[in-house]
Amino acid sequence: MDRVFIEELTVFAQIGVYDWEQQIKQKLVFDLEMAWDCKQAAETDDVVYCLNYAEVSQAIIDYVESKPFLLIERVAYEVADLLESRYQLQGLKIKLSKPKAVAQARNVGVLIVRGCLK
């Protein structure tokens, strides 16, 4: 299966379990792989047959910025549900990072894998 990817999509979200975290916007970084059959787009050179990564990116940004979250796990699962339902993906991999969440670590996060990308 072909894959469409988006790397380092940055979103600023109201996220965290501490009271002070809910008062600020924090950086979240998405890396995505989406199973998508690119054959028809390649054969026709017609954008109507491709997975529009600009549209996918905006859908993620709009959703994550629309409400507060406590956990990145919830963000990752809800974004996965959104993308699967909106774009009928065969598989999906989301790496969601919350940089600087742990002072001694460069990065922390979750990796969600669904469908044929397992």
Curated annotation (Swiss-Prot):
Pathway in which the depicted protein is active: Cofactor biosynthesis; tetrahydrofolate biosynthesis; 2-amino-4-hydroxy-6-hydroxymethyl-7,8-dihydropteridine diphosphate from 7,8-dihydroneopterin triphosphate: step 3/4
Biological process according to GO: folic acid biosynthetic process; tetrahydrofolate biosynthetic process
Database matches in SMART domains: FolB
Catalytic residues of the enzyme: K98
Keyword Transmembrane helix (UniProt): no
InterPro entries linked: Dihydroneopterin_aldolase, FolB_dom, GTP-CH-I_C/QueF
Keyword Lipid metabolism: no
Entry binding sites for substrate: E21, Y53, I72, E73
Catalytic activity, EC: 4.1.2.25, 5.1.99.8
Keywords, ordered alphabetically: Folate biosynthesis, Isomerase, Lyase
GO cellular component: cytoplasm
GO molecular function: dihydroneopterin aldolase activity; isomerase activity
Similarity field: Belongs to the DHNA family.
Protein's job: Catalyzes the conversion of 7,8-dihydroneopterin to 6-hydroxymethyl-7,8-dihydropterin. Can use L-threo-dihydroneopterin and D-erythro-dihydroneopterin as substrates for the formation of 6-hydroxymethyldihydropterin, but it can also catalyze the epimerization of carbon 2' of dihydroneopterin to dihydromonapterin.
PANTHER family given in the database record: DIHYDRONEOPTERIN ALDOLASE 1-RELATED
Protein name, per record: Dihydroneopterin aldolase
Species whose genome carries this gene: Haemophilus influenzae (strain ATCC 51907 / DSM 11121 / KW20 / Rd)
Gene name, Swiss-Prot/TrEMBL: folB
